[in-house]
UniProtKB/Swiss-Prot annotation:
Documented EC number(s): 6.1.1.11
Chain positions recorded as ATP binding sites: 266-268, 353-356
Protein name: Serine--tRNA ligase
InterPro entries xref list: aa-tRNA-synt_IIb, aa-tRNA-synth_II, aa-tRNA-synth_II/BPL/LPL, Ser-tRNA-ligase_type_1, Ser-tRNA-synth_1_N, SerRS_1_N_sf, SerRS_core, tRNA-bd_arm
Cell compartments where the protein resides: Cytoplasm
Organism annotation: Actinobacillus succinogenes (strain ATCC 55618 / DSM 22257 / CCUG 43843 / 130Z)
Length: 429
């Protein structure tokens, strides 16, 4: 969540920024009223507590002098009732303010271009030249089905729309991609590999910002009697980032760099009719996620590094891509700055998103109470959190199939993947 002090001390300015950069309308009148109530109740609570403490001390002194303390006891009891009522009201108002805070998006960094949607994103760079084919280009669905490696009918039979079954060499290529990405990030980029739960509790989802605002995007389990409800993770960002929830980290041990390969589960609410063919938009897909936990002043530098790590995957696979700086209207709820990497897909004759790398600033850390402290310093500070896809495995498979296709329908295996594929250079029927 954003810093509550922005609402307490700069309410009008913060509301204006949210309106201009996020098209988010803050109810200034309601917030001002609640904040005034909170302050008044805080003062009342502190005053009543002080008075009660004084009366309690007076009881002890009166007892020592042998005086009648009945009236003082009555006063303390009365003050206790008033104090409990004031505290209850204070908690109610604070909870109402917190509920509002949880719905407010992060404020974009100053360098983020203002815009309403993806049409106003800014291309930063391109790498690689799209291949020229001397035969009719097939899409990944046709390629995968022709070599008996992709079976969408089986996915529908087993689960429904937006599911697929991979078999044989295609399944192995998919696995090879994930292993290659993990090896690169752990052995060269310095990330710690983690294996995390695919089911998480609601506290975890609040921590990274999926709840309360985006509950419809998740697959929720039905809670068993006596157990808390769970949801399937929409990305490994959720459990991996929450590993530092309620922790005070030593500055000397930062940055923390973690990676995980997991399936991801998304309801794709609001995506009806979009990308209904193939692997581009699935309810279940694999992703290798990168997460960094850093000192506040180093997060923008870390974003460039993390994005570069995702870019290196594409370069080693020799897949043409472009790097895009998202405008304010296209960024995720909790991000303050985001780069998207878009890979070239020949069958669509366009670039499609394959990675999103974001600096979340202290937005998630405040929700999670993830802090850091320097050696010898008593004061703690909120860390900054970053995350990025390194990469979406299914979409990378799509890009490999389409960019490495041959006229006979076979697929040339990228050189860096051959050690994971029994050193074969081509897969086909």
């Amino acid at each position: 969540m954003i810093d509550p002090n922005l609402l307490r001390n700069n309410l009008e300015e913060t509301a204006q920024k949210l309106k201009e950069k996020r098209n988010f309308i803050l109810d200034v009148k309601q917030l001002r009223k609640l904040e005034e109530q909170r302050k008044a109740l805080q003062v009342k609570t502190e005053t009543l507590q002080a008075e009660r403490n004084l009366r309690s001390k007076a009881i002890g002194a009166a007892k020592a002098r042998g005086e009648n303390i009945e009236s003082l006891l009555n006063e303390v009891d009365h003050l206790g009732i008033e104090l409990a009522q004031a505290k209850a009201l204070f908690d109610d108002v604070s909870a109402e303010l917190n509920t509002i805070l949880l719905t407010i998006p992060n404020i974009p960094a100053d360098e983020v271009p203002q815009g309403k949607d993806d049409t106003e994103n800014q291309e930063v760079a391109r790498w690689g030249t799209p291949r020229t084919f001397d035969f009719e280009v097939k899409d990944h669905v046709t390629l995968g089905e022709n070599i008996d490696g992709l079976d969408f009918s089986a996915g529908v039979k087993l689960s429904g729309a937006r599911f697929a079954v991979m078999k044989g060499r295609i399944a192995k290529l998919h696995r090879a991609l994930a292993q290659f990405m993990l090896d690169l990030h752990t052995e060269k980029h310095g990330y710690l590999e983690t294996y995390v739960p695919y089911l998480v509790n609601h506290t975890t989802l609040y921590g990274t910002g999926q709840l309360p605002k985006f509950g419809e995007d998740l697959f929720h389990t039905k809670a068993l009697e006596g157990e808390q409800p769970y949801a399937l993770i929409p990305t490994a960002e959720v459990p991996v980032t929450n590993l530092v929830r309620d922790e005070i980290l030593s500055v000397e041990n930062l940055p923390l760099k973690m990676t995980a390969h997991t399936p991801c589960f998304r309801s794709e609410a609001g995506s009806y009719g979009r990308d209904t063919r193939g692997l581009i938009r699935m309810h279940q897909f694999d992703k290798v996620e990168m997460v960094q936990i850093v000192e506040p002043e180093k997060s923008m530098e870390a974003l460039e590094e993390l994005t570069g790590h995702a870019e290196e995957v594409l370069r080693l696979l020799n897949l043409p891509y472009r790097k895009v700086l998202l405008c304010s209207g296209d960024m995720g709820f909790g991000a303050c700055k985001t780069y998207d990497l878009e890979v070239w897909l020949p069958a669509q004759n366009t670039y499609r998103e394959i990675s999103s790398c974001s600096n979340m600033w202290d937005f998630q850390a405040r929700r999670m109470q993830a802090r850091c402290r320097a050696k010898g310093d008593k004061k703690t500070r909120l860390v900054h959190t970053l995350n990025g896809s390194g990469l979406a495995v299914g979409r990378t498979l799509v890009a490999v199939l389409e960019n490495y296709q041959n006229a006979d329908g076979s697929i040339t295996v990228p050189e860096v993947l051959r050690p994971y594929m029994d050193n074969v250079d081509t897969i086909g029927r």
